[in-house]
């Protein structure tokens, strides 16, 4: 990750290293930004960003694919967001889809387990910011001929007051990656 930080010319970073082929989170930023670490564990990095007009919380989240660990990871995310009073954005690999249109070439429906992503959007009245390129961010197999594709990675936000009208970003652009089953987000 140090090579990426240096190559992209960012001066600062917070990193949760990946384990095997799972996990891994990173926030990079340049000097001059006021960023304060709020929470840091294997499933999330949360930082408070102080702007000249307001503060907001950025959460980078890795929703583990392992069923036995999902409840704990999502519980930490929900607790963090419940304790925060103000605008926030959450970006990451949620390892859930919202509906059947977010997957291709695979069996539709049949999900009996709790969909924590749907609960997050509902409980916090969050907004999924959408996408501007290929909606699928994960593929089983090579990207060009993948048997299954899904939209597992996304950005969700809660805006309060005037921030919604002043700071609403454009849809997230997600370029395809040739070396990982996930696409980087920017």
Language-model regions, residue ranges each:
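A shared catalytic/ligand-binding motif for oxyanion handling
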Residues: 1-186
């Amino acid at each position: 990750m140090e090579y990426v930080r240096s190559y992209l010319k960012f001066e600062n970073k917070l990193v949760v290293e990946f384990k095997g082929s799972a996990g891994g989170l990173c926030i990079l930023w340049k000097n001059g930004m006021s960023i304060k670490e709020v929470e840091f564990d294997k499933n999330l990095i949360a930082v408070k960003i102080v702007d000249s007009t307001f503060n907001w919380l950025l959460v980078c989240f890795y929703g583990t694919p392992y069923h036995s660990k999902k409840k704990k990871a999502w519980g930490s995310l929900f607790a963090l967001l419940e304790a925060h009073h103000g605008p926030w954005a959450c970006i990451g690999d949620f390892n859930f889809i919202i509906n059947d249109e977010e997957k291709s070439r695979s069996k539709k429906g049949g999900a009996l387990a709790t969909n924590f992503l749907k609960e997050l959007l509902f409980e916090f009245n969050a907004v999924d910011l959408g996408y501007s390129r290929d909606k699928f961010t994960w593929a089983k197999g090579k990207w060009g001929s993948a048997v299954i594709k899904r939209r597992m990675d996304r950005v969700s936000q809660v805006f309060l007051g005037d921030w919604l009208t002043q700071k609403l970003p454009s849809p997230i652009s997600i370029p395809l990656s040739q070396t990982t089953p996930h696409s980087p987000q920017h």
